[in-house]
Design a protein with these regions (language model features):
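Nucleic-acid nuclease catalytic cores
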Residues: 152-155, 169-200
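Active-site-adjacent loop/helix micro-motif of nuclease/hydrolase catalytic cores
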Residues: 71-72, 143, 153-164, 175-176, ...
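Short glycine/proline-enriched coil/turn segments at helix->beta-strand junctions
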Residues: 107-108, 167-171
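Acidic-basic catalytic patches of nuclease active cores, encompassing PD-(D/E)XK
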Residues: 2-67, 77-128, 232-235
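Non-catalytic C-terminal interaction segments of nucleic acid-processing enzymes
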Residues: 15-19, 47-48, 52-54, 68-86, ...
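A generic fold-level signal
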Residues: 55, 140-142
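Short, contiguous strand/loop micro-motifs
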Residues: 101-102, 147-149, 170-171
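Conserved catalytic cores of phosphodiester-cleaving nucleases, focusing on short active-site segments
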Residues: 60-68, 135, 143-152
């Protein structure tokens, strides 16, 4: 099942940029139904159109995720804000974080209330004076986060944005109507994939796959896909 989320259908409190009419929108519109995407049959696919992230507004963020992993997510998870997920990613990376360490880095007041929210949402557990991440397969649902940056012309600009997208995505692609071999080679030096949508055919040069989560923004995108699915089901 594929669900497309844009500014008009986004969850409350989430910033999306309105998609403007023009040749780049036409390129993206044509690509979405023809998009080659392999995923497990029990996965859901949520396509975010121009979500607002710290690195910009990527044209598409495709999130492949397991609904079964969200079975115990509820209102406490919905109450989390991006800064909570920033602290969560820190604990996830450290595998163990003393509460005093979190206070030093994030501030005493925020560390206290954020860890309480994360604990209520079943993302972290407390043992003594240290916080530990809960089981990954119950806290992170995304198996793929694929960013797609579309452009007609301005190759350098689209390459730079695609490189920024590797901050949160497991794969980052450039979508263009046509591409040269030199441009493909340049992109692949940075692990960026290229998709050329030429009339009725699609040519793909694969992107390097990176493990998730890449950063706290991966957690933000992960939760955004889940939150968007709730709103979509309740419409």
């Amino acid at each position: 099942m594929r669900t497309i989320i844009d500014r008009d259908s986004a969850p409350d409190g989430v910033v999306f940029r309105r998609t403007l009419q023009g040749p780049e929108r036409e390129l993206v519109d044509a690509f979405i139904p023809a998009m080659p995407l392999v995923h497990a049959p029990d996965s859901r696919v949520t396509i975010l159109r121009e979500p607002g992230l710290e690195s910009g507004y990527p044209d598409l963020v495709i999130v492949v995720w397991r609904d079964s992993r969200t079975a115990n997510w509820g209102d406490a998870r919905l109450a989390l804000v991006p800064d909570d997920l920033r602290l969560m990613h820190y604990i996830f990376q450290r595998r163990r974080a003393d509460h005093s360490e979190l206070q030093d880095i994030f501030g005493s007041r925020f560390a206290r209330y954020s860890t309480e929210r994360l604990h209520d949402a079943r993302l972290v557990r407390l043992a003594g004076q240290a916080w530990f991440p809960c089981a990954f397969d119950r806290t992170f649902a995304a198996t793929k986060i694929i960013a797609v940056e579309a452009k007609i012309g301005k190759w350098t600009d689209v390459l730079n944005q695609a490189r920024l997208n590797t901050w949160f995505a497991s794969k980052s692609y450039i979508l263009v109507p046509r591409v040269s071999e030199d441009q493909v080679q340049e992109a692949q030096q940075f692990g960026i994939g290229v998709v050329a949508h030429e009339q009725d055919s699609i040519r793909e040069w694969d992107a390097r796959t990176e493990p998730l989560p890449r950063s706290y923004a991966s957690w933000v995108v992960n939760d955004l896909a889940w939150r968007a699915s709730i709103k979509h089901r309740n419409r």
